[in-house]
């Protein structure tokens, strides 16, 4: 599977990329900024979207797919729990096994290379417990300062417990783009040493939406014997297909509540990483031959996990990644063109273009001289749009990297494919009214 997040957009129709975007730095011909998807058809899959408020807080959590809800309802109505060995129980087990295989294939993994958990935060903590026996105070961990706290806290905890040195990997900026932080291998290489055992970063920044060059990072990390790359994919998977084999990561984690599903996480661990580095934290009598056997503590939530298979089918077959990428690129283009047209009013963070090889549909900014929290509150209380403000559960990227002037952080607007051109244009008008007329 070709990963749009790491490729040259071979899977995207380049003639359909909208005005204001570029592919590999080359400007494209102007095309109308219109919806790429059939809005009514897509929204028929999301019952919650029938209200008057447009969800522009999707990086915090998306609405749930109808077919996923129905899958859970059907399972709980139809199957016994816990399952036994009778025909009905075996039918339930077959459904569960098929779901797990489909989820694994979604990221080009094998079924014994994935496990489910409560959240990405929880799964990284469990992974830390599993890796703990092969770490000591002579090791070093490299952690990106662009990490969401979920991708940092497990390793900070381990470093404190074991006396491990943490080296902070700062993003690169330029004098011409001081508000556009990007992770590069050039800034990573000086931090690596023969003692480095873990490098952790996110695939996409949940704060500014920038796509990081994970395969390039993996190639550098793996020049150090015994060094592993741990990637937080939460902000990537709603927007791009992911191929963990192509990325050559050791561990990759994401959350389904950001992907039109339940509050559930999935962790990938390569077979090589499992065999070389991981210790089972499960009951002594549970086989540790799979990732489930090593990390899946207690009885799994079958009813929630079965929500994932319909989501995979919807993304890959009903809508398709090509249209998802194109729709979101149009939406980002409209918002960025508005924000960047008023440089004295808005300070925009991250990529200043909508090139889908460089960013996803997360746009962060602050209003000059205004409280970000106040701006977001004024938008939200009008009940037409739902946006977020603050630190996005990422204090280091917010305060240490971006350094907003507002004492209460940033304003974040995040789209997915079910958002529309009409909504974004209306949002720009409403935001303009709020920042220019409201006091």
UniProtKB/Swiss-Prot annotation:
Modified residues (N6-(pyridoxal phosphate)lysine): 258
EC number annotated for this UniProt entry: 2.-.-.-
EC class name: transferase
Chain segments carrying region Disordered: 1-25
Pfam families tied to this protein: Aminotran_5
InterPro entries the UniProt entry points to: Aminotrans_V_dom, PyrdxlP-dep_Trfase, PyrdxlP-dep_Trfase_major, PyrdxlP-dep_Trfase_small
Keyword Zinc-finger included in the entry's annotation: no
Entry's family note: Belongs to the class-V pyridoxal-phosphate-dependent aminotransferase family.
Name of protein: Cysteine desulfurase-like protein ustD
Source species taxonomy: Eukaryota, Fungi, Dikarya, Ascomycota, Pezizomycotina
